[in-house]
């Protein structure tokens, strides 16, 4: 039907006759001539309908926004002064010869150039929303990124293998999405949170290098960077150690950015341990564009009169300082807003000191309600360690280590971007390595895996699995970019005895382990190779590349933060016949029936 895409007609096509199909983006009458901006996925082109062609002009008078049309016309140069440098086709226009309406359109629920729409409106009318040029650019970039991943992995000898979508529910990690079995009453499949165990089994089977771009499912509370179903670039390889795996993955990310954005990322990526990241940035995914850093002052305030500091400092907590250069100019109102902000992360307050004269480490040179409760030696140490200068402000966090890290880490990022404490680098990737193997869960009173229970401990820490699990480090690594974790992985356990030892450290006994993970333990007995891998969040990578506010802007049909699809009204009710076939009764309906019977 067409000879060209609208957005690809250029001055190279001058004097040619072209046939175009697309949507009417905008129609306007001007001096007896009708102008149509015709749109398809490649962009816009201006079409001119002259009254000299009466039939064509009459048809043009009847069309409205979002009508689908086909036209044939001649490409000509726009009159001088009317060019549009923002369009690929901005130097030319098409003089329309014939025009046919392929389909009319009802009045759209909103204009495509309306930037003030609520997300609910956009998601309810997602088909119309996806016609917006920015949304089409986002999804086209997503396609380019996915293809770049594939090209790189194909060239490196990785093979694409599909793994099951209906699998076994395991208790580790987030909640599973369960699928009832009709043919096995009372039993359930689970949708995979990741292909983790299957890709390990593929390594045991000898496939050496695997990848898959696949959907994963997690029934967890949603945030701006989370969805109940998300897309993962999943990778596993055999006979490579941690350094070799991360080197290949680093090359891959550089290749993807080069292909998709024509951007050169640093070579090599910086690396830091998890302990260093938490100490300096309060985060295991630090945004290195922000130049602010945390400074630990726990030891300096153990004997001060200010119990808010000395309490955590003497009971295993943390006291950290965040120096804000020139921050003494912050108003009381701004400080109050930052105090509210850290409260989101569990902080019970936000102490601060304004440094009016750094040469006077007392209430003469320092302005704060807390100065009188800190002795001069502590104040001098704080000023020296933070590198404070006159005119600066120092914020403090004092609490359990996790609360301090979460609160000051988030405040660091917020202050950095709001007040301009950022470097000139547009992209700051960083490997974070040597994660703790376990973390203690106060609610269940047991150790849980920081990554997952199939991660190998560092060789020199194997003996700590039983004696001091909290000190055991893992062969785990995450790749962070601009404050987002875009990928994470580890070297896996490839020996059955070691896997059983880790299960026991997690309070998973041999019988329970065999029941839940027997297929893995059995496979590891048959000559499993050393192996490891990594998974990248495709949605997150594309979100960063586009600068979108949410990953929902780079997914064609996303769920809301309440895990709903407003377009299809899912999840929804199903009829009783389907439930009976699945051997399911709804508790709410049963309770309602009982109440009716009692009445």
Swiss-Prot record:
It catalyses: tRNA(Asx) + L-aspartate + ATP = L-aspartyl-tRNA(Asx) + AMP + diphosphate. One of its GO terms (molecular function) is nucleic acid binding. Keywords: Aminoacyl-tRNA synthetase, ATP-binding, Cytoplasm, Ligase, Nucleotide-binding, Protein biosynthesis. GO terms for biological process: aspartyl-tRNA aminoacylation. The record marks 30, 81 as: Important for tRNA non-discrimination. Residues 196-199 are annotated as: Aspartate. GO terms for cellular component: cytoplasm. ATP binds at residues 218-220, 227, 485, 537-540. L-aspartate binds at residues 172, 218, 451, 492. It is found in: Cytoplasm. The keyword Aminoacyl-tRNA synthetase applies. Coiled coil: none annotated. The keyword Cell membrane does not apply. Its EC number is 6.1.1.23. Homodimer. NCBIfam families: aspS_bact, PRK00476.1. Aspartyl-tRNA synthetase with relaxed tRNA specificity since it is able to aspartylate not only its cognate tRNA(Asp) but also tRNA(Asn). Reaction proceeds in two steps: L-aspartate is first activated by ATP to form Asp-AMP and then transferred to the acceptor end of tRNA(Asp/Asn). Belongs to the class-II aminoacyl-tRNA synthetase family. Type 1 subfamily. This is Aspartate--tRNA(Asp/Asn) ligase. The gene is aspS.
């Amino acid at each position: 039907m067409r000879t060209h895409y609208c957005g690809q007609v250029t001055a190279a096509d001058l004097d040619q006759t072209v046939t175009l199909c697309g949507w009417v983006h905008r129609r306007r009458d001007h001096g007896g001539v009708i102008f149509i901006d015709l749109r398809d996925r490649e962009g816009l082109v201006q079409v001119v309908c002259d009254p000299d062609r009466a039939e064509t002009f009459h048809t043009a008078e009847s069309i409205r926004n979002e009508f689908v049309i086909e036209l044939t016309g001649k490409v000509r140069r726009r009159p001088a002064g009317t060019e549009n440098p923002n369009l690929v086709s901005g130097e030319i226009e098409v003089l329309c010869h014939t025009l046919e309406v392929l389909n009319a359109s009802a009045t759209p629920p909103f204009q495509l150039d309306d930037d003030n729409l609520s997300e609910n409106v956009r998601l309810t009318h997602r088909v119309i929303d996806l016609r917006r040029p920015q949304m089409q650019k986002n999804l086209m970039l997503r396609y380019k990124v996915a293809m770049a991943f594939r090209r790189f992995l194909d060239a490196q000898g990785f093979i694409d293998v599909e793994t099951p979508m209906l699998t076994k529910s395991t208790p580790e990690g987030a909640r599973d999405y369960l699928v009832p079995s009709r043919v096995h009453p009372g039993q359930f499949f689970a949708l995979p949170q990741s292909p983790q165990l299957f890709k390990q089994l593929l390594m045991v089977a000898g496939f050496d290098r695997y990848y898959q771009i696949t959907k994963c499912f997690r029934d967890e509370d949603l945030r701006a960077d989370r969805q109940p179903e998300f897309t993962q670039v999943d990778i596993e390889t055999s006979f490579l150690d941690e350094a070799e795996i991360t080197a290949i993955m680093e090359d891959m990310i550089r290749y993807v950015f080069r292909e998709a954005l024509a951007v050169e990322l640093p070579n090599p990526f910086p690396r830091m341990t998890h302990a260093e990241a938490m100490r300096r940035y309060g985060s295991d995914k630090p945004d290195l564009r922000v130049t602010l850093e945390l400074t630990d002052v726990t030891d300096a305030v153990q004997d001060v009169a200010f119990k808010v500091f000395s309490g955590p400092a003497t009971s295993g907590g943390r006291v950290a300082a965040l120096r804000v250069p020139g921050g003494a100019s912050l108003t009381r109102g701004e400080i109050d807003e930052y105090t509210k902000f850290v409260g989101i992360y569990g902080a019970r307050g936000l102490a601060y000191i304004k440094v009016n004269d750094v040469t006077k480490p007392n209430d003469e040179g320092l302005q704060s309600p807390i100065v009188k409760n800190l002795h001069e030696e502590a104040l001098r140490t704080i000023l020296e360690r933070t590198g404070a200068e006159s005119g600066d402000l120092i914020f403090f966090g004092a609490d359990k280590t996790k609360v301090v890290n979460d609160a000051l880490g988030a405040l660091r990022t917020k202050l950095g971007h709001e007040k301009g404490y950022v470097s000139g680098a547009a992209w700051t990737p960083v490997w974070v390595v040597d994660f703790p193997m376990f973390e203690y869960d106060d609610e269940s009173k047991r150790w849980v895996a920081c990554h997952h229970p199939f991660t190998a401990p560092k060789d020199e820490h194997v003996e700590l699995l039983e004696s001091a699990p909290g000190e055991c480090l893992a062969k785990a690594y995450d790749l962070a970019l601009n404050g987002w974790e875009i990928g994470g992985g580890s070297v896996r356990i490839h020996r059955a005895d070691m896997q059983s030892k880790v299960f026991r450290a997690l309070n998973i006994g041999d019988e329970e382990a065999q029941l839940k993970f027997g297929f893995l333990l059995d496979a590891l007995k048959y000559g499993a190779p050393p192996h490891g891998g990594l998974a990248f969040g495709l949605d997150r990578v594309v979100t960063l590349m586009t600068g979108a506010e949410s990953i929902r802007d780079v997914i064609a049909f996303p769920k809301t933060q309440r895990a709903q699809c407003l377009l299809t009204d899912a999840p929804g009710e199903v009829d009783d016949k389907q439930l009976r076939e699945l051997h399911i009764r709804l508790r709410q309906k049963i309770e309602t029936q009982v109440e009716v019977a009692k009445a």
